[in-house]
Amino acid sequence: MLKKAKWKDDCLSPILLGIDDLCDGYFKKDYEKIFPFFDAGYGTSNDGSIFRYLNKNLLQKYPEIKITFFLPFGKGAYWDKEKSIINDIFERDEFEKFLNFVLDCDYEIAYHGHDHGLVNSTIDPNTWCCEFDQYSKEEYFEIIKSDLAKFKDKFGYEVCGGRSPGYKFKDDLIDGLCECGFKWWSFDYKPFINNINLKYNGYNIIEMPSNLSGDMFNYGKNPIKSAAKYFLNLYRLEHMIKGGQAVSIAEHFFRTRFDGKIQMPNIYNDINSLDFLFGYLRNKDIWYATFSECANYYESYNNTDISDMGDGVFEIKYKGSWKMFLTFISEYRYLENIQTKEIYEGFMKNNRWLFNDLVEGIYRGHQNVF
């Protein structure tokens, strides 16, 4: 027997954490000291920064967490330049070092637009001018291609996916995302819905989910309503995990909005909710993944075929466009690649042998060393 595991290491479900709006910005220009509730990334990992706050209160406690940071690559157009500090991500050496540190931690950087769009002083969603409405289609995607090329040149890193600010996008622009080389995109927030698909509206780009809010376990003023919300959200979360769904937690790096209101969800306000959530998940049979890791696995699972040729011989064929990234399950401890003569040894989980490093080819199963 040789078959595919639905998720890596035959885990029940992948857990993703996507954090929007990391940028080289700080809300109060006249403040000499950095405070986490005014920081969007300008403080890098220094004392008082929002990243230091996140690291101290969550990441050190749960080092298994994988994060995909969604970054606007240019200067945020909605920032008040008179009162705030805002740079594009390529301007400051200290921020460049910080992004290299983020990548060295095996976190992911994804695209979150160029300037995040324009907005009026009240941040009325009805008056939001999306990036793609500021330019022609050709101009818009030339900006994106330039951002991606510059990032790859500077960091040696290829950005695989992204998410539009506010999840706003037009279907007639999706072909442009494909032309830019994006393999996946997070198109919409759908609470407790497993919105992961191999193609989005027929386009060759993977739809990645966003389905949990990081503030889901924050307590409100009404204890009865808070308790009801708590148990309902736990039930929904359990249902997703047991159903093998991709769980994708949505958060924001920046707390303060420019109309004086608080942006929700946000890391600063939601730290206790996130602490409870990841504490609850710790004993679950789950896989912590970045968006690209999850997308790659999902693509591999749906594009890999196994043929049973009899007598313990199996053929693996992959017809996808990425490198195959897949866990296989077998009754055999050893699998011999008949073509290359290489022997792979599995690892035991739930009384079955698992393999993470198989490639395309024909394999013969063996129970013992030979």
Where are these regions (language model features)?
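A solvent-exposed, charged loop/short amphipathic helix patch at secondary-structure junctions
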Residues: 25-44, 124-135, 260-264, 269-275
